[in-house]
Amino acid sequence: MFARQAFRCAQPLKQGFRKYSTEAPKGKSSLAPIYAAVGITGVGVGLYRYNSATAEAPAAVDRPKVFKGGDQGWFDLKLSEIEVLNHNTKRLRFEFEDKEALSGLQVASALLTKFKPADAKAVIRPYTPTSDEETPGYIDLVVKVYPNGPMSEHLHSMNVGQRLDFKGPIVKYPWETNKHNHICLIAGGTGITPMYQLAREIFKNPEDQTKVTLVFGNVKEEDILLKKEFEELENTYPRRFRAFYVLDNPPKEWTGGKGYISKELLKTVLPEPKEENIKIFVCGPPGMYKAISGTKNSPTDQGELSGILKELGYSKEQVFKF
Protein backbone atom coordinates (compact mmCIF):
# COMPACT_ATOMS: atom_id res chain seq x y z
CA MET A 1 0.00 0.00 0.00
CA PHE A 2 1.27 3.45 -0.82
CA ALA A 3 1.03 4.71 2.74
CA ARG A 4 3.30 1.96 4.02
CA GLN A 5 5.78 2.00 1.17
CA ALA A 6 6.09 5.76 1.21
CA PHE A 7 8.49 5.95 4.13
CA ARG A 8 11.11 3.72 2.56
CA CYS A 9 12.67 6.55 0.61
CA ALA A 10 11.94 10.11 1.71
CA GLN A 11 13.34 11.98 -1.29
CA PRO A 12 11.39 10.14 -4.02
CA LEU A 13 8.32 10.51 -1.82
CA LYS A 14 8.83 14.24 -1.59
CA GLN A 15 9.22 14.62 -5.33
CA GLY A 16 6.24 12.40 -6.10
CA PHE A 17 4.06 14.01 -3.50
CA ARG A 18 4.75 17.55 -4.69
CA LYS A 19 3.65 16.39 -8.13
CA TYR A 20 0.50 14.91 -6.63
CA SER A 21 -0.17 18.11 -4.72
CA THR A 22 -0.03 20.33 -7.78
CA GLU A 23 -1.29 18.16 -10.62
CA ALA A 24 -4.50 19.17 -12.33
CA PRO A 25 -7.56 17.01 -11.60
CA LYS A 26 -8.88 14.69 -14.25
CA GLY A 27 -11.67 15.89 -16.49
CA LYS A 28 -15.22 15.01 -15.58
CA SER A 29 -15.46 12.39 -18.30
CA SER A 30 -12.54 10.39 -16.90
CA LEU A 31 -13.95 10.48 -13.37
CA ALA A 32 -17.46 9.48 -14.36
CA PRO A 33 -16.79 5.71 -14.48
CA ILE A 34 -15.30 5.86 -11.00
CA TYR A 35 -18.30 7.60 -9.53
CA ALA A 36 -20.63 5.23 -11.32
CA ALA A 37 -18.68 2.23 -10.05
CA VAL A 38 -18.96 3.25 -6.40
CA GLY A 39 -22.55 4.39 -6.75
CA ILE A 40 -22.01 8.05 -5.98
CA THR A 41 -24.44 9.73 -8.33
CA GLY A 42 -26.16 12.10 -5.96
CA VAL A 43 -28.15 12.18 -2.79
CA GLY A 44 -31.01 10.11 -4.20
CA VAL A 45 -28.80 7.12 -4.96
CA GLY A 46 -27.02 7.44 -1.62
CA LEU A 47 -30.32 7.34 0.21
CA TYR A 48 -31.63 4.45 -1.92
CA ARG A 49 -28.66 2.40 -0.83
CA TYR A 50 -29.93 2.57 2.74
CA ASN A 51 -33.55 1.81 1.77
CA SER A 52 -33.16 -0.91 -0.86
CA ALA A 53 -36.08 -2.89 0.54
CA THR A 54 -38.53 -0.09 -0.18
CA ALA A 55 -39.58 1.77 -3.30
CA GLU A 56 -37.94 5.08 -4.13
CA ALA A 57 -36.62 6.74 -0.96
CA PRO A 58 -37.85 10.24 -0.15
CA ALA A 59 -35.45 13.06 -0.91
CA ALA A 60 -33.18 14.19 1.92
CA VAL A 61 -34.72 17.66 1.88
CA ASP A 62 -38.13 16.14 2.73
CA ARG A 63 -36.93 14.18 5.74
CA PRO A 64 -37.35 15.52 9.29
CA LYS A 65 -34.19 16.57 11.15
CA VAL A 66 -33.49 15.33 14.68
CA PHE A 67 -30.91 17.89 15.83
CA LYS A 68 -32.05 21.45 15.23
CA GLY A 69 -29.79 23.47 17.52
CA GLY A 70 -30.89 26.78 18.96
CA ASP A 71 -33.20 26.43 21.96
CA GLN A 72 -34.08 22.79 21.21
CA GLY A 73 -32.50 21.65 24.47
CA TRP A 74 -31.40 18.17 25.55
CA PHE A 75 -33.17 14.97 24.54
CA ASP A 76 -32.28 11.31 24.84
CA LEU A 77 -31.61 8.58 22.28
CA LYS A 78 -31.59 4.82 22.78
CA LEU A 79 -28.42 2.78 22.30
CA SER A 80 -29.32 0.14 19.72
CA GLU A 81 -26.00 -1.49 18.71
CA ILE A 82 -22.49 -1.91 20.12
CA GLU A 83 -19.47 -2.89 18.02
CA VAL A 84 -16.07 -3.50 19.62
CA LEU A 85 -13.40 -1.99 17.35
CA ASN A 86 -10.30 -2.77 19.41
CA HIS A 87 -9.09 -3.20 22.98
CA ASN A 88 -10.26 0.26 24.09
CA THR A 89 -12.66 1.58 21.44
CA LYS A 90 -16.30 0.88 20.60
CA ARG A 91 -18.68 2.05 17.91
CA LEU A 92 -22.02 2.93 19.53
CA ARG A 93 -25.19 3.34 17.47
CA PHE A 94 -27.99 5.51 18.86
CA GLU A 95 -31.32 5.26 17.06
CA PHE A 96 -33.91 7.93 16.33
CA GLU A 97 -37.57 7.48 17.22
CA ASP A 98 -38.39 8.32 13.59
CA LYS A 99 -36.45 5.82 11.47
CA GLU A 100 -36.83 8.08 8.39
CA ALA A 101 -35.33 11.14 10.11
CA LEU A 102 -31.86 12.51 9.39
CA SER A 103 -29.49 13.76 12.08
CA GLY A 104 -29.56 17.36 10.85
CA LEU A 105 -25.78 17.66 11.17
CA GLN A 106 -23.64 19.44 8.62
CA VAL A 107 -19.93 18.97 7.97
CA ALA A 108 -17.95 19.61 10.05
CA SER A 109 -19.96 19.53 13.28
CA ALA A 110 -20.24 17.70 16.59
CA LEU A 111 -22.84 16.85 19.24
CA LEU A 112 -22.79 17.34 22.99
CA THR A 113 -23.42 14.31 25.20
CA LYS A 114 -24.47 14.45 28.86
CA PHE A 115 -24.98 12.14 31.80
CA LYS A 116 -25.26 12.79 35.54
CA PRO A 117 -23.48 10.43 37.95
CA ALA A 118 -25.09 9.86 41.32
CA ASP A 119 -24.29 12.66 43.78
CA ALA A 120 -22.13 14.49 41.23
CA LYS A 121 -22.36 17.24 38.65
CA ALA A 122 -23.45 16.42 35.12
CA VAL A 123 -20.67 15.44 32.73
CA ILE A 124 -20.83 17.01 29.25
CA ARG A 125 -18.51 16.08 26.38
CA PRO A 126 -18.52 16.70 22.60
CA TYR A 127 -18.34 13.83 20.10
CA THR A 128 -18.23 13.86 16.30
CA PRO A 129 -20.54 11.24 14.76
CA THR A 130 -18.92 9.02 12.14
CA SER A 131 -22.18 8.02 10.44
CA ASP A 132 -23.14 9.67 7.16
CA GLU A 133 -25.29 12.77 7.58
CA GLU A 134 -27.58 11.52 4.80
CA THR A 135 -28.21 8.15 6.45
CA PRO A 136 -31.60 8.09 8.20
CA GLY A 137 -32.51 6.54 11.52
CA TYR A 138 -29.37 6.72 13.67
CA ILE A 139 -26.00 8.22 14.52
CA ASP A 140 -22.75 6.36 15.25
CA LEU A 141 -20.15 7.46 17.80
CA VAL A 142 -16.63 6.01 17.89
CA VAL A 143 -15.58 6.19 21.54
CA LYS A 144 -12.19 5.39 23.06
CA VAL A 145 -12.23 4.77 26.80
CA TYR A 146 -9.75 6.82 28.84
CA PRO A 147 -8.74 6.06 32.45
CA ASN A 148 -10.55 8.49 34.75
CA GLY A 149 -12.51 9.81 31.76
CA PRO A 150 -16.04 9.93 33.17
CA MET A 151 -17.93 10.24 29.88
CA SER A 152 -15.92 7.65 27.94
CA GLU A 153 -16.13 5.23 30.88
CA HIS A 154 -19.89 5.77 31.08
CA LEU A 155 -20.35 5.21 27.35
CA HIS A 156 -18.32 2.00 27.46
CA SER A 157 -20.41 0.76 30.39
CA MET A 158 -23.72 1.27 28.57
CA ASN A 159 -25.83 -1.65 27.39
CA VAL A 160 -28.20 -1.87 24.43
CA GLY A 161 -31.51 -0.29 25.37
CA GLN A 162 -30.06 2.37 27.67
CA ARG A 163 -30.41 6.04 26.78
CA LEU A 164 -28.07 9.03 26.55
CA ASP A 165 -28.77 12.77 26.44
CA PHE A 166 -27.72 14.70 23.33
CA LYS A 167 -27.74 18.31 22.18
CA GLY A 168 -26.54 20.07 19.05
CA PRO A 169 -25.25 20.38 16.47
CA ILE A 170 -22.12 22.41 17.17
CA VAL A 171 -20.74 23.57 13.83
CA LYS A 172 -16.93 23.57 13.83
CA TYR A 173 -15.90 24.32 10.23
CA PRO A 174 -18.71 24.70 7.66
CA TRP A 175 -17.61 22.88 4.52
CA GLU A 176 -18.55 23.96 1.01
CA THR A 177 -17.81 22.16 -2.25
CA ASN A 178 -14.26 22.95 -3.41
CA LYS A 179 -13.75 25.34 -0.51
CA HIS A 180 -10.02 24.58 -0.68
CA ASN A 181 -7.78 23.11 -3.39
CA HIS A 182 -5.97 20.82 -0.95
CA ILE A 183 -6.62 20.03 2.71
CA CYS A 184 -4.33 18.21 5.13
CA LEU A 185 -5.67 16.26 8.10
CA ILE A 186 -3.24 15.79 11.01
CA ALA A 187 -4.82 13.56 13.65
CA GLY A 188 -3.98 11.58 16.74
CA GLY A 189 -6.15 8.90 18.36
CA THR A 190 -9.88 9.66 18.33
CA GLY A 191 -9.07 13.05 16.82
CA ILE A 192 -9.61 11.14 13.58
CA THR A 193 -13.42 11.39 13.81
CA PRO A 194 -13.88 14.97 12.50
CA MET A 195 -11.24 14.23 9.86
CA TYR A 196 -13.20 11.24 8.62
CA GLN A 197 -16.41 13.27 8.62
CA LEU A 198 -14.73 15.87 6.41
CA ALA A 199 -13.04 13.40 4.05
CA ARG A 200 -16.23 11.39 3.59
CA GLU A 201 -18.19 14.53 2.70
CA ILE A 202 -15.63 15.51 0.07
CA PHE A 203 -15.36 12.15 -1.68
CA LYS A 204 -19.06 11.36 -1.81
CA ASN A 205 -19.65 14.56 -3.78
CA PRO A 206 -18.77 14.19 -7.50
CA GLU A 207 -18.50 17.97 -7.84
CA ASP A 208 -15.86 18.29 -5.12
CA GLN A 209 -12.32 17.94 -6.47
CA THR A 210 -10.47 18.79 -3.25
CA LYS A 211 -7.25 16.83 -2.66
CA VAL A 212 -6.82 15.34 0.81
CA THR A 213 -3.72 14.27 2.73
CA LEU A 214 -4.05 12.39 6.02
CA VAL A 215 -1.28 12.06 8.63
CA PHE A 216 -2.51 9.86 11.47
CA GLY A 217 -0.52 9.10 14.62
CA ASN A 218 -1.24 6.31 17.12
CA VAL A 219 0.48 4.19 19.75
CA LYS A 220 -0.04 0.71 18.28
CA GLU A 221 -1.28 -0.64 14.96
CA GLU A 222 -4.53 -1.87 16.51
CA ASP A 223 -5.21 1.71 17.63
CA ILE A 224 -5.63 2.94 14.03
CA LEU A 225 -9.35 3.73 13.85
CA LEU A 226 -11.37 3.76 10.62
CA LYS A 227 -8.38 2.36 8.70
CA LYS A 228 -10.58 0.23 6.46
CA GLU A 229 -12.64 3.26 5.50
CA PHE A 230 -9.56 5.34 4.69
CA GLU A 231 -7.98 2.50 2.69
CA GLU A 232 -11.14 2.33 0.61
CA LEU A 233 -10.87 6.05 -0.13
CA GLU A 234 -7.19 5.68 -1.01
CA ASN A 235 -7.89 2.80 -3.40
CA THR A 236 -10.84 4.56 -5.03
CA TYR A 237 -9.28 8.02 -5.33
CA PRO A 238 -5.50 7.47 -5.60
CA ARG A 239 -4.97 10.80 -7.38
CA ARG A 240 -6.71 12.80 -4.67
CA PHE A 241 -6.24 10.99 -1.35
CA ARG A 242 -3.06 9.89 0.41
CA ALA A 243 -2.72 8.50 3.94
CA PHE A 244 0.40 8.30 6.11
CA TYR A 245 0.37 6.36 9.39
CA VAL A 246 2.78 6.85 12.29
CA LEU A 247 3.10 4.53 15.31
CA ASP A 248 4.84 5.23 18.61
CA ASN A 249 5.12 1.50 19.36
CA PRO A 250 5.11 -0.26 15.97
CA PRO A 251 5.34 -4.01 15.38
CA LYS A 252 8.59 -5.42 14.04
CA GLU A 253 7.30 -5.69 10.47
CA TRP A 254 5.89 -2.13 10.37
CA THR A 255 7.15 -0.12 7.37
CA GLY A 256 5.28 3.12 8.06
CA GLY A 257 6.33 6.06 10.20
CA LYS A 258 7.77 5.43 13.65
CA GLY A 259 7.69 7.58 16.76
CA TYR A 260 5.73 10.82 16.75
CA ILE A 261 4.49 12.93 13.85
CA SER A 262 7.69 14.80 13.06
CA LYS A 263 8.72 18.00 11.38
CA GLU A 264 10.62 16.00 8.75
CA LEU A 265 7.54 13.95 7.86
CA LEU A 266 5.22 16.95 7.60
CA LYS A 267 7.75 18.84 5.49
CA THR A 268 7.83 15.85 3.13
CA VAL A 269 4.13 15.09 2.71
CA LEU A 270 2.32 18.41 3.16
CA PRO A 271 1.91 20.95 0.35
CA GLU A 272 4.27 23.89 0.64
CA PRO A 273 2.98 26.97 2.49
CA LYS A 274 3.20 29.05 -0.69
CA GLU A 275 0.65 26.89 -2.50
CA GLU A 276 -2.71 28.57 -3.06
CA ASN A 277 -5.87 27.85 -1.09
CA ILE A 278 -4.66 25.09 1.22
CA LYS A 279 -5.94 24.33 4.73
CA ILE A 280 -4.42 22.19 7.47
CA PHE A 281 -6.71 20.68 10.11
CA VAL A 282 -5.36 19.43 13.44
CA CYS A 283 -7.16 17.25 16.01
CA GLY A 284 -5.72 15.08 18.75
CA PRO A 285 -4.52 14.96 22.36
CA PRO A 286 -3.14 18.08 24.08
CA GLY A 287 0.48 17.04 23.60
CA MET A 288 0.00 16.74 19.85
CA TYR A 289 -1.59 20.18 19.60
CA LYS A 290 1.31 21.67 21.53
CA ALA A 291 3.90 20.08 19.26
CA ILE A 292 2.15 20.55 15.91
CA SER A 293 0.12 23.77 16.02
CA GLY A 294 -0.21 25.16 19.51
CA THR A 295 -3.38 24.84 21.56
CA LYS A 296 -6.69 26.65 21.27
CA ASN A 297 -7.51 29.32 23.84
CA SER A 298 -11.16 28.26 23.91
CA PRO A 299 -13.73 26.51 21.68
CA THR A 300 -14.26 29.82 19.88
CA ASP A 301 -10.67 31.13 19.96
CA GLN A 302 -8.11 29.33 17.79
CA GLY A 303 -5.19 30.94 19.58
CA GLU A 304 -1.85 31.70 17.98
CA LEU A 305 -0.10 29.27 15.65
CA SER A 306 3.07 27.71 17.05
CA GLY A 307 4.94 24.42 16.93
CA ILE A 308 6.02 22.52 13.84
CA LEU A 309 3.55 24.12 11.43
CA LYS A 310 4.77 27.62 12.28
CA GLU A 311 8.38 26.48 11.95
CA LEU A 312 7.58 25.16 8.47
CA GLY A 313 6.24 28.55 7.41
CA TYR A 314 2.47 28.08 7.51
CA SER A 315 0.30 31.00 8.58
CA LYS A 316 -2.41 31.09 11.23
CA GLU A 317 -5.00 31.49 8.47
CA GLN A 318 -3.87 28.21 6.86
CA VAL A 319 -4.50 26.13 10.00
CA PHE A 320 -7.69 25.11 11.82
CA LYS A 321 -7.66 23.37 15.20
CA PHE A 322 -10.69 21.18 15.94
From Swiss-Prot:
Reaction equations catalysed: 2 Fe(III)-[cytochrome b5] + NADH = 2 Fe(II)-[cytochrome b5] + NAD(+) + H(+)
Protein role: May mediate the reduction of outer membrane cytochrome b5.
Any one GO MF annotation of this record: cytochrome-b5 reductase activity, acting on NAD(P)H
Cellular localization per UniProt: Mitochondrion outer membrane
Chief site of localization: mitochondrion
A GO BP entry: ergosterol biosynthetic process
One Pfam family linked to the record: FAD_binding_6
Named cofactor requirement(s): FAD
Lineage top rank: taxon: Eukaryota
Ranges for domain FAD-binding FR-type: 72-176
A GO CC annotation given for this chain: mitochondrial outer membrane
Bilayer-crossing regions: 31-48
Membrane topology: Single-pass membrane protein
E.C. number(s) listed in UniProt: 1.6.2.2
Keywords carried by this UniProt record: FAD, Flavoprotein, Membrane, Mitochondrion, Mitochondrion outer membrane, NAD, Oxidoreductase, Transmembrane, Transmembrane helix
Primary gene name: mcr1
Family to which the UniProt record says this protein belongs: Belongs to the flavoprotein pyridine nucleotide cytochrome reductase family.
Protein name: NADH-cytochrome b5 reductase 2
Alphabetized InterPro entries for the sequence: CBR-like, Cbr1-like_FAD-bd_dom, FAD-bd_FR_type, Flavoprot_Pyr_Nucl_cyt_Rdtase, FNR_nucleotide-bd, OxRdtase_FAD/NAD-bd, Riboflavin_synthase-like_b-brl
Residues that coordinate or bind FAD: 179-214
